[in-house]
From Swiss-Prot:
Keywords: Ribonucleoprotein, Ribosomal protein. GO terms for biological process: translation. Belongs to the bacterial ribosomal protein bL32 family. This is Large ribosomal subunit protein bL32. The gene is rpmF.
Length: 59
């Protein structure tokens, strides 16, 4: 098992963890229906950029 040679200082520890923060996912609003969805993904009702691209089961 790997064992460190020297103790990592608090500064270096913080730098190591600097990319671990969680961010909220970006959301877009569909211009025609007002549905909220992730950017570059279809909305839950099957619309993408104002066009119907997927037939949803409930319709």
């Amino acid at each position: 098992m790997a064992v460190q040679q020297n103790k990592k200082s608090p500064s270096k520890r913080g730098m190591h963890r600097s990319h671990d923060a969680l961010t909220a996912p970006a959301l877009s609003v569909d211009s025609t229906t007002g549905e909220v969805h992730r950017p570059h993904h279809i909305s839950p009702n099957g619309m993408y950029r104002g066009r119907k691209v997927v037939k949803v089961k409930g319709e």
